[in-house]
């Protein structure tokens, strides 16, 4: 289209404009040289893109533009016209152009129809070629020659090239067939649309982007003319506009960016002409004319010998060309370096881009800059003409040189370089540097045509920069269009391509094999953030590939085993099978005897088995740390006294400290020791019990103690008595005052004294220490226990003590409450604590105490003093330590249980005090129970009533205090019918347990005390009958095997209990310290209850026969049940224990296995049976009244504690769930109490195979085992082609096979002449007719890939193998740009929670610290500030230009100046400024200048960069800051600081306009 136009001319200068888009012209403009004098010709110069007029331009000369006017040319002409002739003439011109355009368009009658969309005929061949290369990439991945990342990159590259070549074919098709095709004209004239959209209409839609901008591998091959399939339609919508909501959100974020920009710079207005600054910025180079245009020179510039351009000159376009040509450093002024305080001066700003002349005064350049920067974001977010998510690559691939015709390659010389691997997995040659002569030929292609003269195509060195890729080699034959060279366009861009990670998973389960894996393990480098957490320092070691790695996954069935009990020390898992064994389904693979290194309890809950560990485990494992524990206990618990006797408890104590309840356990053990001391009155029994405690204390000296048990006990008892006089000063005095409740403060002193005593005399002090020690650990509680022992010495004293004991109970409670507080006067503060915790408890306790005191006196008189005193002592202890008191002399085994029980109570108490109000209630209820039980001990009579009421209400009582108090009162009444009461108690206990069991089960500590026993009893009732039958049968079967031996052993045990014990101790010392301890406890218990044993002669007989096996023992118990109903209770508990330990139906099996274990440690296990809860119950039933009283408290404890406590504690802290797989068989065994001993198998597990196949191996990793089986489906058999005559021999046939057994073959590898493998794998077998291959997949790992597996790992399906890293191609779209631009404007330090490496603040600080070393402070400050300003401007402009948006540099500079206008004070000196305060740099410079003149010290400061939001909020104008964000915070601070707002800038009057109107009205 040629247009002629006449217009008037003024004095025409070379126009100072230059179209920014001129580089995008689709046509070339050629110079026209007309020698005729008529009409003057205006020439468009291609190089400078400006219009030059001949010098002899005549007035009113018509100008002729002989060129096709598209959009950009029109822009250029109108801009020049405006500059030359002003606005009025330009408006007329544009109006005329519009009319001409409409007129011509109407005449042409161009229309657009469906038939105008002509699809290029080459499309089908292009698509088929692309799909072939896609198949090749998939095969290369299958063969292990490509990584998955390279495959996807190659696919994307292939389809991108296909799409591009299709576009070119479409354009060529239009030009060749119909140059006036309306679609073609519309796109190429710039009227509407662009080539990208025409491509979608007639070629193919191409690759699509997902919402994150990443390219999808699936290209849309259709175009809009053909129509899209459903899949293609969904894909094309996925990345295009991503829905209206998305657009709305993005528009909001783009608008918010504009608002922040406006708020930050709205006050920047041109007020002054010249700030007289000495600072500026420099440009140098050949391509700086755009940068110079419109700026003002800072210094004079010498152009040549004759001309000097003075400073403060505005650089026009012609001057810019001249300045760029001289290639010198040009100093110009910039808004960054303007010296005005808050705005910019006229000369620093320079040209007004809208007017084309120097900016006027009063121009709001800040808001113009903000709008110029913010508008592209809004506009581009909304640009509906965008290509719709079609992948348009940022940085289109490298410039390529295809072969123009078929020919042969010839190189002139050897080229330096190296082979590299491209992102698409191709191996090419990288040229390191270019030749010395740029005109020299790099390579030439010579056509191989025979008929014509050969054609030659040459590529010169200057065309191919260093870093280019060479795709052909010397002498290679090339085809037309084949890629020869890719020229690199290496850009020094700081913007890194986004790096993405790709996870590679195994497609099937199997075994891993590393073929070649060059691995480097690096510990993660922690970026130095503002606050690094200490946790970050222990980071996992990462394993990277330092080069390409190859590995395989061989298919097999992997069966995982969830056991964490596999033998980890040896690092092996034992199996019944060896490699190559054939396994059928449900075959046991291996057997595990589950052994636990700790002592614990097994409990069955629903379908799972829980292992609860008791306190004992610590005793066993940590015997040697007693001294350490000792100190820990002192430090932690304010318990000053921990004697050597308490060693066992001490060891437990520190261990349990990890769990909150552990400390309590320790205390319990102490209480039990104290009980033993009380029982010292009975010489034999006392000595045994004492030994037991000592044994617990000193494992190493067990033998010696055993040998001289009687001596030691006697000595200790003597000491005790004798110490009574000595102790009266220290210990005894303490106890007496406690009893009398004379002074509590004495107790503390006494405790300290006790500690001293221990240090002085370990042996003697041990006894005393035990009692005292108890007081210390339980603080007052233990002290009370000591008093009981003294009472036992003198019956009268005992009675008195009991009275005191009533008071003591209250003391005990107080101690428990104030256990951690250590109050000086324990009585008063303890009572207070009780009151606070619950009034009911205090009242109930007090009543019980008073009644107890009275009753105890009368009862004691009637019955034997020694027995009563013992029971009384127990009662006192029980009140203090709920569980401990019950078993003082009864059972050593029960004693261990007691420990656990006491610990539970103590724990609950401590928790109450320290932690939870809710728990306090429950704990208090427990305390009441303890008191009740203790009262029972004191008054055996009351037991009767107790049995009736308590059986049903005891558990409830724990919840309701009133019921308990009633039971206390009723206790006093009945003394006569003791035995009958006992029987009732037993029955009621059973019922009681059943009723209460469900309600209390859920509670942890509470449940342990009360409900667990009940629960067990339930089990006993239900399973009891069955057990009896089963066990009896077993007896019959097994008696013949070991009757003789067993009988002998049993007899020995029964008759000579003590000597047996000594022998056992000697034997056990070497093997199991734990077992020894248990056995000791059991035997002394038997002595205590020796009468009961004698009573049941049948029991003795039964024991000898079944002794060898646990079954027999159980039978003995059964016989007891038959003999006496009283024992019946105890027996069920025994049975129930067994049941609980075993899983549901495997009880019989468990018994059998137990017999085996017994043989190993025969003596130890038998005592355990006797010493369990069962014994307690038996004693209760059979013991004399005195014994019964003692036992009854034990019974209550057993209900609440002995069974349940350890398990609930474990559920809270230590319990482990043992997860059993369904496919496996379990046989459980455990002792009666459900206790599990160390090194004794609790169950035998048979792991069964889940599949049929060939066993490969077992692997242990991370405490989990897995087995590998090769199934039939994991192998493939190839039938060899029967091409060979049948006569030929086997060997010759074999020779034809190109592979060998054990070889790894890849997809496509030739295995037989002319035949390739259709899969990858390892050859297992080669015969005459077939080859068997184990399926496998080879993988390729790229450099810097993260490896997650190790050699020979057994992997389940979808297991992560490695993480590949790649730089991802992304679409260019402002959608990706806005977050980046916002990140720069806000000077963000973090992104997605991770610190950005080399962020603005890091760069500024590091540059400033470096500059300070070299330069003086002020110079370093200016340098670093200018550095970060220029860096920020450059990065922002780069981010915009990546989106195809050009913004004038000065706009960005105005904004960046505001972001760096403040500094941070580091040291205020004489300025009264605070460190960390932000202040305007110009203001601070004024302050410092005046300080220096007054000879004071100026403030020190450092440069900072504030994001837009922070700089607005830091603004001096509080109205601006409050209108932006955080209104109330800003206004309150400003009011407190009494700030004044001077209403500078454009927006302030808007905020207060309404106020000023009101003032006028007033």
Swiss-Prot record:
It comes from the Eukaryota. The keyword Nucleotidyltransferase applies. It holds the Pfam family RNA_pol_Rpb1_4. Its EC number is 2.7.7.6. DNA-dependent RNA polymerase catalyzes the transcription of DNA into RNA using the four ribonucleoside triphosphates as substrates. HAMAP family: RNApol_bact_RpoC2. In plastids the minimal PEP RNA polymerase catalytic core is composed of four subunits: alpha, beta, beta', and beta''. When a (nuclear-encoded) sigma factor is associated with the core the holoenzyme is formed, which can initiate transcription. This is DNA-directed RNA polymerase subunit beta''. The lineage of its organism: Eukaryota, Viridiplantae, Chlorophyta, core chlorophytes, Trebouxiophyceae. The gene is rpoC2.
